[in-house]
Regions:
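Short, well-ordered beta-strand segments enriched in hydrophobic/aromatic residues
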Residues: 21, 29-40, 109-117
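Short beta-strand segments of immunoglobulin-like
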Residues: 21-23, 100
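Cleaved targeting-peptide boundary
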Residues: 10-17
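Mature, soluble, non-transmembrane domains
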Residues: 88-203
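N-terminal signal peptide c-region/cleavage motif recognized by signal peptidases
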Residues: 6-8
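Short acidic-glycine loop/turn motifs at beta-strand connectors
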Residues: 26-28, 88
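Structured domain cores in non-transmembrane regions
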Residues: 44-122
Length: 203
């Protein structure tokens, strides 16, 4: 199941994530790491339990959780772990995480991992962080603005803003472009970018 997370570009999500995101900055003002905590919905979490509970005890032990983390690390690599970062309009590539830690609590799969830029990236001008699935198969939600944070030295000199686009307004403003062909593009669409909650940092 996990290897098939973003199987197609459907117009509505099938997997739901309650997420927390933290931009950690180094003393020199560069991005140290992007910390992610993902809590999956109960339906998807149950399917993961069915797939990985080799012991048949209705839970996931350390070995099984390690297998879950490895599967996610491998399967989401081609999707950039749903992480999209731009610095003054230029994309910032992210390196593959060293590992993804998986846990299973109260019927929910929880993934914790950190990403680092492939090259040293300083917070200068406008840096935008978006966590979203371009295929629209998975919905990533940040319940409050405090779930997208900035820490480290840059937190004192930079301004942080969480942007939550209104889907209805986005549809109205882009009505001509949002055709059925647009949504059926297997490579994903710009619509996910238009409606995704994002963290904007001005330095």
């Amino acid at each position: 199941m996990l290897s098939l997370l973003p199987v197609s570009a459907l117009a509505h999500p099938h997997i739901f994530i309650d997420a927390k995101f933290e931009v950690v900055t180094a003393p020199d003002g560069s991005i140290s790491e992007l910390r992610n905590v993902w809590n999956f919905d109960e339906v998807f979490s149950s399917s993961v339990l069915m797939d990985f509970d080799k012991a048949g005890d209705q839970t996931l032990n350390a070995t099984e959780l390690k297998a879950v983390g490895k599967t996610v690390r491998d399967s989401l690599a081609q999707y950039g772990y749903y992480t999209n970062v731009t610095s003054n309009g230029k994309a910032v590539p992210m390196a593959k995480p060293d590992a993804i830690q998986a846990d299973y609590k109260d019927g929910s799969l929880i993934l914790t991992f950190s990403l680092k830029p492939e090259q040293k990236t300083f917070l200068k001008g406008t840096t935008i962080f978006g966590i979203y699935d371009k295929t629209l198969y998975t919905a990533v939600d940040f319940a409050t603005d405090n779930d997208m944070t900035l820490s480290g030295t840059a937190s004192g000199r930079c301004k942080r803003k969480v942007v939550r686009p209104n889907p209805k307004e986005v549809m109205a403003e882009n009505q001509a472009a949002l055709t059925s062909m647009f949504f059926s593009d297997p490579k994903g669409t710009d619509y996910s970018l238009l409606v995704a909650t994002r963290l904007e940092v001005q330095c």
